Swiss-Prot record:
It is an enzyme of class 4 (lyase). Belongs to the LeuD family. LeuD type 1 subfamily. This is 3-isopropylmalate dehydratase small subunit. InterPro entries: 3-IsopropMal_deHydase_ssu, Aconitase/3IPM_dehydase_swvl, AconitaseA/IPMdHydase_ssu_swvl, IPMI_Swivel, LeuD. Pathway: Amino-acid biosynthesis; L-leucine biosynthesis; L-leucine from 3-methyl-2-oxobutanoate: step 2/4. HAMAP family: LeuD_type1 (MF_01031). It comes from Halalkalibacterium halodurans (strain ATCC BAA-125 / DSM 18197 / FERM 7344 / JCM 9153 / C-125) (Bacillus halodurans). The gene is leuD. Catalyzes the isomerization between 2-isopropylmalate and 3-isopropylmalate, via the formation of 2-isopropylmaleate. One of its GO terms (cellular component) is 3-isopropylmalate dehydratase complex. The keyword Amino-acid biosynthesis applies. Its EC number is 4.2.1.33.
Amino acid sequence: MEPLKTHTGTIAVLDRVNVDTDQIIPKQFLKRVERTGFGQFLFFDWRFLPNGEDNPDFELNQPHAKQGTILVAGHNFGCGSSREHAPWAIKDYGFRVVIAPSFADIFYNNCFKNGILPVKLKQEEVTALMEKGKDTAYSLTVNLEAQTVTSEDGFEATFEIDGYWKEMLINGWDEIGLTLRYEEQIKQFEASRV
């Protein structure tokens, strides 16, 4: 995985609550196990009209949101069935950070495992970001090392994160990569047991 220490990008506002994994990536697109190629299906039923054209009313189809790399959403984001395809689609679409007041637990952990930083901010902070970014391009800097979210206009917030996940993202490790860091010690242990 690519390390994540600091990320600066434009926000895309999804002012909806209880966005479940079926809405993030609909079931008809779950027939593959590769981690790439799912971004084109992200929020498919909202992003596209029945004829396949972009839905002009959908938040992420607005010109200022199309280049967003930080998704700002409502509470309980990622609820519903457990599917790792949901963070795969979010990352493949181009989001590196998701900010919300709360996340479903399994989705929250799956984000870390796939190189996405889920940031929990207070409801009033998320509401302020939504107001700032709903109609215009609005840039944020998320500093994982300092655990801050800031902007040039003075917005500033802090967030909590488990030390394990923080270290994993900062170093760009997934669980397999972390295990491989101890490959020599594992071999020595195995040799001592023969």
